């Protein structure tokens, strides 16, 4: 397999500009590419999000094309060499991608080594076998929780270690992942803020 993946836990970390914390990794990932096809379906303001990505990636001399703005999204993916799936709400993202019938094509091209995949937050969730370890509220109902399966395990982005707060009575992130593991015999990678996972073929490297 010749998967090329860069999966960010988050687009932003405290005190840094949008995508700034991962600029070096993103720059290396974008190096062979001239155009970034950007999928902003996880947010409501797709124009604004695409422009924000365009500004953030401007140092890398790439053209950013919003997938939502093209006449035929499937044809655009079939021709693209790099797809960036942005963060936001994972359920909204999955619903849109399923309705456009994009997931099968994306997975096929990534596995064939024809499409590099950059994901952030919700886009990282989408790279997993399922959506079931997202932190997001299910504001819409996708057809299925099945996702791309570009890594053989689940990821929980924005992972937070349990803090000592005696007044907090809700579940911690660790407890919620534990509930998932009660029902599923699957590895879950908790990715802290500012970290990213790089896949080059069969090699996986966690950095940040």
Which residues does each predicted region cover?
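Patatin-like phospholipase A catalytic core
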Residues: 2-14, 195-208
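Charged helix-capping and loop-helix junction motifs
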Residues: 20-23, 52, 98-104, 139, ...
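N-terminal beta1-alpha1 cap of cysteine-dependent amidohydrolase-like domains
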Residues: 1-86
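Flexible gly/pro-rich beta->alpha loop and the following alpha-helix that scaffold active-site loops
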Residues: 62-116
């Amino acid at each position: 397999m010749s998967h090329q993946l860069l999966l960010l836990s988050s687009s932003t970390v405290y005190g840094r500009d949008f995508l700034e914390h991962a600029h070096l990794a993103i720059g290396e990932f974008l190096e062979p590419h001239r155009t970034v096809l950007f999928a902003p379906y996880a947010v409501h303001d797709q124009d604004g999000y695409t422009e924000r990505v365009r500004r953030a990636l401007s140092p890398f001399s790439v053209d950013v094309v919003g997938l939502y703005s093209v006449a035929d999204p499937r044809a655009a993916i079939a021709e693209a060499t790099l797809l960036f799936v942005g963060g936001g709400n994972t359920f909204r993202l999955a619903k849109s991608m399923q309705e456009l019938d994009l997931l099968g094509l994306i997975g096929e091209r990534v596995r064939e080594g024809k499409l590099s995949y950059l994901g952030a937050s919700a886009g990282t969730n989408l790279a997993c076998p399922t959506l079931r370890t997202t932190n997001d509220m299910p504001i819409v109902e996708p057809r299925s929780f099945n996702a791309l399966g570009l890594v053989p395990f689940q990821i929980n982005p924005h992972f937070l270690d349990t803090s000592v707060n005696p007044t907090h009575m809700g579940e911690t992130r660790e407890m919620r992942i534990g509930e998932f593991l009660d029902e599923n015999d699957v590895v879950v990678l908790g990715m802290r803020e500012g970290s990213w996972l790089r896949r080059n073929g069969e090699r996986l490297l966690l950095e940040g």
